Amino acid sequence: MAAIDHGADAVYIGASRFGARAAVGNSVDDIRKLCDYAHCFGAKVYVTVNTIVYNDELETTRQLLLDLSDAGADAILVQDMAVLEMMDGLPMAAHASTQTDNRSAEKVRWLRDVGFSRVVLARELSLDEIREIHSQVPDVELEVFVHGALCVSYSGICYASQYCFGRSANRGECAQFCRMKFSLQDSNGREVLHDRYLLSLKDMNRVDHLEDLVEAGASSFKIEGRLKDLSYVKNVTAAYSQRLNALIRRHPDLYCRSSQGVCSYNFTPDLNRTFNRGYTTYFLHGRMPDIASMDTPKAMGAFVGMVKEIRHDSFNVAGVASFANGDGLCFLDEARQLIGFRANKVVGNRIYPYRMPHGLKPGTRLYRNNDQEFDRLMSKPSAERRIPICMTLRDVADGFELSASIHDKKYTLHYPAALQQAQKPPHDNIIRQLTKLGDTIYVCEAVDIPAGFNYFIPNSLLSDMRRQLVEKLVSQREEPLQLDVAKPSACAPYAYPYLNNIANQMARDFYGAKELSAYELKGGDGPIMQCRHCIRYALGYCVKHGGQRPVWQEPLSLILGDGRRFTLEFDCKNCQMNVYAS
């Protein structure tokens, strides 16, 4: 609900099962309450049922979909085509999860043809690629990620967690293989790099590129917010909502928000004060250097200055940042290890840690990964969302009509009453009583009363009129969407059959296939990860992009801390790095 209050037009939420975060779930009753609240603002609720489903779970999934439909969910985010089949006839839209690996116009067209109204595109796509997909498939909504954590593999075709730990990312149990330490060896056993986070990416931040994305064909912006705290949800939602509003103000004839309500904030959104591993626009403008966070997978936060002078119990910081008692601070030592500590006391720019951290030296770059003052601010009520309405009061033969207008919609109620001439001008009192909307989600901007209106209306009746009108506004719901699910022809587009993620008979029948099975069921000898992130490029050795010629003997291998080895294949033709279990 905090995301709605801070400006979201829609929210994703996981149900009790089959969401992409198995450890986090919400009851149907909680989802119903969220739907009721969101729908007051015309905002939507999308429920994630985007894992693959096994045969013995099909009936449970079917019942869950029925329950979610009854709760008022607007759409279901889908990976397994059995879920799409079971949605046939239910009044919810089907959105294709990024877990369906959506990186080509061909794939997006196929998803549209089988019944999806919206496709969440792969995070890796550039503006040009998004634009090309939109030009070829203009009649499907394209949702793009704009902020948050990045998976290093194309989503839906990462099997590293399943291979290593028996925990499938396609079942919502990702073990964060890409946030682990690896050493890099060449084929002669020479160590190129030791104990680095070679697959760990920075976090996405595209707040400065919303207009570019809209012009390319994006119709929805997605913030990755799973497993994040309340402060993150509030701050990031508000930041993007404000930027989107600014975009609409520049182009009022082209764009509008899909929900209602004006937000007022008790804080200034600042993305640097929220959890982040450093920011990147990823591949939005093509391949760029420095998208990885190889020193640490943890949040370093914003740079706050350089360590200047060190004493036995304190140090001071050169810079303009202000600090607070309890701030979490960190730095990288000479071995590029992240060292974190708390500020016990702050006096100006002098910081007294609980314990002086080892390795801190003059000239060290200091970061703040926990902003105590900002967190305190975010822990309080920080935003209010109200829907502006305009009221109109008219006299009719047997009483009064009170209307409320919201944008282009008008809601009218009739109140039988005897018409009594007022002894003194009634307008001021009528306006005062009708605009007392208190803790409702509405704010009255104007009350239109005819100039010749001169009737006495008791305050008790005015209060009843106001209350009944608000109840009518709150009770309004959009008509449910009727979904038609088309039947596809047999489709097995991948070189490695398990990449279709078919884990049950219903999905197998959907594809018209007999032998295709998910990696989780039968394994496979193909890549366990396909990545646009390229370690060779990141280290400056991509000849295709002007780098120097490699000094090592390929193939390269990633060595996990427990000794397991993973071979890297550089598919330069497709500008892709594949990871194989050795």
Q: Residues of each region from the PLM?
A:
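Surface-exposed amphipathic alpha-helical tracts and adjacent flexible/coil segments at the periphery
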Residues: 1-5, 10-20, 30, 34-35, ...
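An active-site metal/cofactor-coordinating segment within enzyme catalytic domains
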Residues: 23-27
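Short glycine-enriched loops at secondary-structure junctions
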Residues: 51, 79-83, 100-102
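Short active-site loop/helix that positions an aromatic residue
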Residues: 84-89
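Short, glycine/polar-rich helix-capping loops at beta-to-alpha or helix-loop-helix junctions
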Residues: 103-107
